[in-house]
Amino acid sequence: MAGHSKWANIKHRKGAQDAKRGKIFTKLIKEITVAAKIGGGDLEANARLRLAVDKAKQANMPKDNIERAIKKGTGDLDGVTYEEGTFEGYGPGGVAVIVEFMTDNRTRTVADVRHSFNKFGGSLGVSGSVAFMFDRKGQIIFGENSDFEKIFEVALEAGAEDVNDEDGVTEVITAPADFETVRNTLAEQGLTPESAEVTMIPQNMTAVEGKQAESLMKMIDMLEDNDDVQNVFANFDISDEEMARIMG
């Protein structure tokens, strides 16, 4: 799930992902396999594979699992063939939602995703219905009480597009092509982020609260529980207090 960038939501997302570590491994293995199939198994020459392997390492995936996934992608080991793509639609409260998927059975995935939208009052749309509301960017988040001035200086010098501060949380935005350079430069300066990824960032946020916020989070959780779903992006804005109440 990727929505509002406030620290409360980042922490919710991280906690939810940690609780679903088995599913996270499944999704990461798919991403590594597809990246290796498309661009080959050489990490130096395949940026998508490099990013996928980095995420797997951050999730503490065993090295053997990573190497096996690469070999399945390159054909050195037998593996499943996956189709990838996106679904777009609206969730409760008119929140725009993008779902990235990888599947070996598109018919099943379409039915499952549509069911998740419908169950909680959302609606699946056509391709292009909400994608224009998002930009693909590198996003590097530093936790509360981070050294904004140092991050700002290092990040912009390394090629970042923007650096924001909100309640002590620092967010660095980059073009996708510059993400690795900026992240690595920050790391070399001893600046370790809470999260770092190429993601879809909303251009505008949609505020939701009460029952709509609850239904939205349930819908997103149901989508993320689907093994065929890789990522869910949404332009929701839920207050810290409301998010804490929903997550109980």
Swiss-Prot record:
Its main location: cytoplasm. It is found in: Cytoplasm. GO terms for molecular function: DNA binding. GO terms for biological process: regulation of DNA-templated transcription. Keywords: Cytoplasm, DNA-binding, Transcription, Transcription regulation. One of its GO terms (cellular component) is cytosol. Pfam families: TACO1_YebC_N, Transcrip_reg. Belongs to the TACO1 family. This is Probable transcriptional regulatory protein Pcar_2335.
